[in-house]
């Protein structure tokens, strides 16, 4: 976690007050929130995989979630859609993944159709593997807007 703080991630001051808190072995921290702009935010969680207690600042990144509160919709007017698109594009200046933040479900599946799970209720696609050490899994979960199939949320989780 300290690397992200040193790198300039603008965690909330009230949450940074917790970085000295103890994290027991095999436990995760609470969720840290970062507002990228009025429409885009991120969340982070950290894990202690050592055999001893450590502080939250020493814990390893185990979860990242990027999400847009709003994405363009077919029933929104053009100016509203332009505003949402601009907020997402603006967030891409501060947050980089190996795919565009304007990714559509079709584009994702064209590049990799080996998903481990499809969820029609959430219009999501997952690429996950089971952890070899802990109960749970690691991987990517992409959630798309049901109307436009535009990416609205990505979460990346890691367990050894």
Please place each PLM-identified region on the residue numbering.
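Extracytoplasmic Gram-positive cell-surface binding/anchoring modules and repeats
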Residues: 1-2
């Amino acid at each position: 976690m300290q690397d992200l703080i040193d790198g300039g991630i603008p965690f909330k001051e009230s949450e940074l007050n917790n970085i000295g808190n103890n994290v027991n072995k095999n436990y995760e921290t609470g969720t840290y929130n970062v507002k990228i702009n009025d429409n885009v935010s991120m969340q982070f969680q950290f894990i202690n995989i050592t055999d001893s207690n450590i502080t939250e600042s020493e814990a390893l990144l185990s979860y990242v979630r990027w999400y847009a509160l709003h994405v363009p919709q077919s029933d929104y007017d053009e100016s509203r859609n332009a505003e949402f698109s601009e907020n997402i594009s603006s967030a891409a200046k501060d947050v980089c993944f190996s795919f565009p933040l304007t990714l559509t479900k079709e584009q994702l599946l064209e590049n990799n159709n080996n998903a481990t799970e499809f969820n029609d209720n959430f219009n999501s696609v997952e690429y996950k593997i089971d952890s070899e050490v802990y109960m749970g899994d690691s991987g990517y979960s992409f959630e798309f807007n049901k109307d436009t199939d535009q990416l609205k949320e990505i979460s990346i989780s890691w367990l050894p």
